[in-house]
Amino acid sequence: DNPHYQPWRDRIEQELEAVDEAVILVGHSFGGSVVLKYLAEGSYQKPLRGLFLVSVPNWGPDGWAYEEFAVPHDVGLRLPASRIFLYHSRDDPEVPFAHLGYYEERLPAATARPIDGSEHSFLRGLPALVDDIKTLPR
């Protein structure tokens, strides 16, 4: 597999163009990093109710060092107004827990939820995420 950003970006944009109301976006792992980069580009101008990022890798030079998927250093200043939540297992076997710290620094208004355990995919669910979605204004 050799994924590239542009096809994923185009698909996200296509799906979001079809929605006329404020959306809640949930991005997991690679998908979360693509959604975050897309939003940071600034082309999405519709209301965003919430952004929920789960186990998102840092593609920057102090992470996995793959520039094509790296978000800008000032990503927190580029995002549409919205509540942002970050979730990451302390012992994630796929994406190191330190990647959460990277996003905490760049998204200071975000609420970080470190999760005890070694989940990456959260196959049994992520109750904290569900609870946080329920707190969003309608």
Regions of interest found by a model, annotated:
Residues P3, S118-V130:
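Catalytic histidine-centered segment of alpha/beta-hydrolase-like enzymes
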Residues V26-L36:
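Gly/Ala-rich beta-loop-alpha elbow adjacent to hydrolase catalytic centers
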Residues K37-G50, W59:
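Conserved hydrolase catalytic core segment
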